[in-house]
Structure formats: structure tokens, C-alpha cells
């Protein structure tokens, strides 16, 4: 019997994986210039980490986690997001003791949520994320957003926008929660069951509801910005000032709260405006999470970060009809004629590869015409032709597939010639 992949997952096949590697390299190169270092955490963690870190009342914890028991009855969960695990690693490995702070981390890898699969949303999905832990400076907030926007710019995207908000400190949110309850309570029965249950547990999450987003009460909800105390308002003003100084355009959305419980002060999303991108326009999202480090067992250490969907980045590139510079083809394909030439080509192609020259030979015993077709399909820049006559004369014919020019080269000079003409 045949097998299919589980619903909500995908195979990333050769060709497409080149595009993934290209954008991932943009992410890694950008992190290097901003001095963020890679961290690799386990794909599964103790369930309690996400319950405490992400929030008991969130959709992620309530409905979407892949949780299982190991053979000793311990509850483990496939990671649904990256921040909680990064903070756990920060605490457990005492990264807070490093003399240079903040600790700047990035990660790339699969996450898992049991959601309804749709375009741009999978049950196994890939995220790139960064965390800056150990500083409560508005400048680091601006840096984090600048880094994200820089990645989209380097990927060639033009139709993106940064949307920001402030959730304020604990006192500001307390005042705002009271105002939200007062606003929603008279007609809360008109909302979905999830929003009704959140009214007195976490009313800010009502603003993040996808089902009721267009409800008139949602549109007329009070703005959190009017409930910021002096300190929180000043912090937000400083963040905006730095973004202005960096020349980064942004919009303010007072209903932007994000879907995780640990956010405070700065919250932001980056969205695609590309025509035909689809219903899910959010490319990345993040914010400040002061208090999370202490909440999961560490010292006082404020932090900020974001997560970026790699699938949605590639979808946005397609929506804007951008071509990534991948699939350049190989440097050289060796066409052989005769058994002795084939035997010699096995060691010759090995030497080419060891010299850093991408190259290939025939493994299907094709005739010469078939080998030339394979070279064409592989987009070989040079086609080296080796028969038994050439081998006896210690020579090889080299054809430039772009110009059609063909030259004869001594075998002991062949690798040097290929190296000199290698693709950039």
C-alpha cells in the first residue's frame, strides 16, 4: 500500500528547497550583522513550559498543542512556538551571567500546531525567530523591528507594512481590561463562545479573535493607548522616535494585541499588501515580554523578539512575482564515450567536486545524445567530452554551453581551467 503525508504537512522538494535555503541564508546573514547567534532547542519540551510561558488561556495551549506522554508518563509537547524554549535555555544555561547583555539569539526550525490547514497555514510549519533578552531599552525594540524589515527588503519584497501598538505595563493593562469588560459585557452573548469565556479571564484576547473581528463592538472598543500610564506612554513614544530616526514607516493599530499572553509594552506585526496574497496577511509578529523569564524560573530579565513564517515569506515573494536567484545549474557535466572513459570520469568528477566545482556524470549508461540532454536539463555551463581517443592523448574537449565555443584542454590542466571559469 502507498502512504501519504499527514494532513497539514508538506514535502519541500529539490528545487523548492533551494528557495528555502536562499531566504534562510538571508536571515542568517542579517543576524550576523546584528550580532544574533543561533540557538537550537529540542523539538519537544515539557508541557508545563508552554502552559506557563505561552499562557493557559491561549488557543495554542487550549486547542492546538501536540501533547503526548512518554513511556514514564511524563507529559511532553511538540513546540508550538520558539520563545518559551529559548527563554528556558537562557535560564537553564545561565546565559544571563554573560558579561555582555542583552543576549541575542535566533532560531530556524519546525513548529507544530493542530490548526485547520489552509493556504499559508500548516500543522507543521517553519519559523525564523529572534530573541533579545536582558535589556529594556526602546532602542532594542526598534532594532528588532528593523532586523525583521531588513530581511523582507533583502528578499525583494516591496508590499509590506509594519503595524505597531503598545500594551503598556501591568498597571496600564489592568485599567484597560476593566474598560474592555465594561464595553463588551452588555452584548457579550453576541460574540463567539471563546470570546464569552475570555471576558473575565483575558478580555484583551477578544481583540485578537478572528471570528468576531468585524463585530461593531470590536470596532468601537476603547483604545489601549488612552489607558497607558505616563511611563508606558513615554516608552512607546521613544520606540516611535527610534523608528522615525531609522526611516522605518509604520502604522499604529490600537487593537493589535497578538495571540500570546506574555506580551507587554511594544507589540507589532508585519503584513503583506501584495495583491492576491490571500486572507492571512501577517508575515511576522512579535513584541516585548518583560516578566516571562522570571515566570518560567529565571532572574529578572526583560526581553523582546519576533517570529517569522518562512512559508508566508515565500508566498509573499510569489505574490509579488519576485524571482529568487537560485537554480543556477552546475559548473560542468562530463559526457563519456566508452568504458575506459567512464571509469576515468568517476575519479575526475570526484576531483572536480573536491576543488569546489559542481559537476556531474552519467550513472544510467546513456548514449552520448542522452548525456547531452541531461547536461542541458542540469543547466551545465560547461560540457566536457571524454572518449577513449581523448583519454589516450591525455586530453578532454570542453564546450561552453553559453557561447558554443569548444576547446581542447590537457587533462592535467582541466581542473585549473574549470576553476578559472567557475560560475559566481
From Swiss-Prot:
**Gene Ontology biological-process annotations:** histidyl-tRNA aminoacylation
Q: Which organism is it from?
A: Bacillus subtilis (strain 168)
Gene Ontology terms, cellular component aspect?
cytoplasm
Family the UniProt entry places it in = Belongs to the class-II aminoacyl-tRNA synthetase family.
Q: What class of enzyme is it?
A: ligase
Keyword Cell division tagged: no
Please name the GO terms that the record assigns under molecular function: ATP binding; catalytic activity, acting on a protein; histidine-tRNA ligase activity; transferase activity
The protein's annotated catalytic reaction(s) are: tRNA(His) + L-histidine + ATP = L-histidyl-tRNA(His) + AMP + diphosphate + H(+)
Subunit-level organization = Homodimer.
Q: What is this protein called?
A: Histidine--tRNA ligase
> What gene name is given for the protein in this entry?
hisS
Q: What is its main location?
A: cytoplasm
Amino acid at each position: 500500500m502507498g502512504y501519504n503525508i499527514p494532513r497539514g504537512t508538506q514535502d519541500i522538494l529539490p528545487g523548492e528547497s533551494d528557495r528555502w535555503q536562499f531566504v534562510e541564508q538571508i536571515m542568517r546573514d542579517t543576524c550576523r550583522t546584528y550580532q544574533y547567534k543561533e540557538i537550537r532547542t529540542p523539538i519537544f519540551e515539557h508541557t508545563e513550559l508552554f502552559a506557563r510561558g505561552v499562557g493557559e488561556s491561549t488557543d495554542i495551549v487550549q486547542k492546538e498543542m501536540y501533547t503526548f506522554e512518554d513511556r514514564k508518563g511524563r507529559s511532553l509537547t511538540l513546540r508550538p512556538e520558539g520563545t518559551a524554549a529559548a527563554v528556558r535555555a537562557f535560564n537553564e544555561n545561565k546565559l544571563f551571567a554573560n558579561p555582555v547583555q542583552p543576549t541575542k539569539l535566533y532560531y530556524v526550525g519546525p513548529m507544530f500546531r493542530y490548526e485547520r490547514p489552509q493556504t499559508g497555514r500548516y500543522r507543521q510549519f517553519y519559523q525564523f525567530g529572534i530573541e533579545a533578552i536582558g535589556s529594556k531599552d526602546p532602542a532594542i525594540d526598534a532594532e528588532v523591528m528593523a532586523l525583521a524589515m531588513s530581511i523582507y527588503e533583502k528578499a525583494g519584497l516591496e508590499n509590506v507594512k509594519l503595524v505597531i501598538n503598545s500594551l503598556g505595563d501591568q498597571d496600564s493593562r489592568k485599567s484597560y481590561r476593566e474598560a474592555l469588560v465594561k464595553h463588551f459585557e452588555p452584548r457579550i452573548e453576541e460574540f463567539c463562545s471563546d470570546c464569552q469565556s475570555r471576558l473575565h479571564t483575558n478580555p484583551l484576547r477578544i481583540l485578537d479573535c478572528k471570528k468576531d473581528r468585524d463585530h461593531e463592538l470590536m470596532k468601537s472598543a476603547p483604545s489601549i493607548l488612552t489607558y497607558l500610564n505616563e511611563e508606558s506612554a513615554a516608552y512607546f513614544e521613544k520606540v516611535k522616535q527610534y523608528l522615525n530616526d531609522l526611516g522605518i514607516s509604520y502604522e499604529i493599530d490600537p487593537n493589535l494585541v497578538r495571540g500570546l499572553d506574555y506580551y507587554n509594552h511594544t507589540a507589532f506585526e508585519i503584513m503583506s499588501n501584495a495583491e492576491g496574497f490571500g486572507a492571512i496577511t501577517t508575515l511576522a509578529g512579535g513584541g516585548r515580554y518583560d516578566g516571562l523569564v522570571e515566570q518560567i524560573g529565571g532572574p529578572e530579565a526583560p526581553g523582546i523578539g519576533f517570529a517569522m513564517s518562512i512559508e508566508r515569506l515565500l508566498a509573499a515573494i510569489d505574490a509579488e512575482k519576485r524571482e529568487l536567484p537560485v537554480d543556477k545549474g552546475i559548473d560542468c557535466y562530463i559526457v563519456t564515450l566508452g568504458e575506459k572513459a567512464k571509469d576515468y570520469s568517476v575519479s575526475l568528477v570526484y576531483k572536480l567536486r573536491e576543488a569546489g566545482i559542481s559537476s556531474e556524470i552519467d550513472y544510467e549508461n546513456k548514449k552520448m545524445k542522452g548525456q547531452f540532454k541531461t547536461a542541458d536539463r542540469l543547466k551545465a555551463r560547461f560540457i566536457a567530452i571524454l572518449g577513449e581517443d581523448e583519454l589516450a592523448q591525455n586530453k578532454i574537449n570542453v564546450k561552453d554551453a553559453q557561447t558554443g565555443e569548444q576547446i581542447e584542454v590537457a587533462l592535467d590542466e582541466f581542473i585549473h581551467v574549470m576553476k578559472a571559469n567557475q560560475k559566481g
